A protein has these predicted regions:
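Conserved glycine(s) of the Walker
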Residues: 143
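Conserved pre-motif I regulatory segment
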Residues: 14-139
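N-terminal cationic and glycine-rich segments that engage phosphates or anionic surfaces
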Residues: 3-4
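Transmembrane signal-anchor/signal-peptide helices with a preference for the extracytoplasmic
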Residues: 8-12
Length: 144
């Protein structure tokens, strides 16, 4: 208990490691307000294509006689690397998109649904944690 006061809890230390990534997301997010909707859609498509191409390039570079499980593991590793590479920009685009549609409503299954959310930093920290394959629990008790 005393050590936790000096060094912080494991959770505090883990969150502190994520703060530089959160800062990058928020810095990039700030630049997106000047982009058009079409710019964001185009960039999102480019990011998707990047991930797909990384998978394809890895699959094509592997020997055909390679064990199927090993082959799939290598392709998955390439895909994860691509997702890690685009994560900051993808999360910034999502945050900007949420800001733009905040206050909009849709009719879904006969019910009016109002979008009222732009992700808070703590939610982005949870998303970064989930992206890395770890379990995340919000202070509200909401776990993923």
């Amino acid at each position: 208990m005393i050590l936790a006061k000096f060094f912080g809890t494991k959770s505090d230390r883990e969150m502190k490691k994520l703060l530089p990534t959160l800062d990058k997301i928020n810095q990039l997010y700030e630049t997106f307000s000047s982009k058009t909707d079409e710019d964001l859609v185009t960039r999102t498509q480019e990011l998707k294509e990047f991930v797909i191409n990384q998978r394809l390039e890895k699959a094509q570079s592997l020997h055909a006689d390679m064990d199927q499980q090993e082959r799939e593991a290598e392709i998955l590793k390439a895909e994860q690397g691509a997702l890690d590479f685009i994560m900051v920009e993808a999360f910034a685009i999502v945050k900007e998109t949420c800001r733009r549609i905040c206050g909009s409503s849709w009719r879904i299954s006969g019910q009016e649904t109002l979008w009222e959310m732009v992700p808070y930093d703590v939610q982005l920290l949870g998303a970064i944690t989930l992206h890395s394959g770890k379990v995340s629990e919000m202070k509200t008790g909401e776990g993923k």
